[in-house]
Amino acid sequence: MPDQLVLGDWETLRDDATRIRFTVFVDEQKVPAAEELDDLDAVCRHALVFADGLAVATGRLAPDGRIGRMAVLASHRRKHYGAQIMRALLTEADAIGHAQTYLHAQCHALGFYEKFGFVAEGPIFDEAGIDHRTMLRPRGAR
């Protein structure tokens, strides 16, 4: 079965997105479970990639242009699923007309986001016990 990318709302994609996020952020990275789900989920566009029928990657785009909650199951990393999610969310952001998109990148992942035209801004900061940097991308940058 070929990979499938799905964009949708929280009501539609919640179960699969939550499973991936809790596996990656709560179980692997030890982010407190209470911090993983938030009120933004209900108003974001969400993306999932399915491989062989299993949801393996997720991310979201907030109404203000912030991309977040990018996660790929460990068993499916280095297979470009994160890139599929990012391309879909950036296409969505550009179509909506955001002048720029931004995100809080875990420091170890800065290089991944740079490939999509994001540029790091400002100092390193702590978010959920993990070092992050803000990254910005002007509309249409590649």
Q: Where in this protein do the model-derived segments appear?
A:
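Conserved GNAT acetyl-CoA-binding A-motif
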Residues: 92-106
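Conserved catalytic-core motifs of GNAT/GCN5-like acyltransferases
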Residues: 104, 119-134
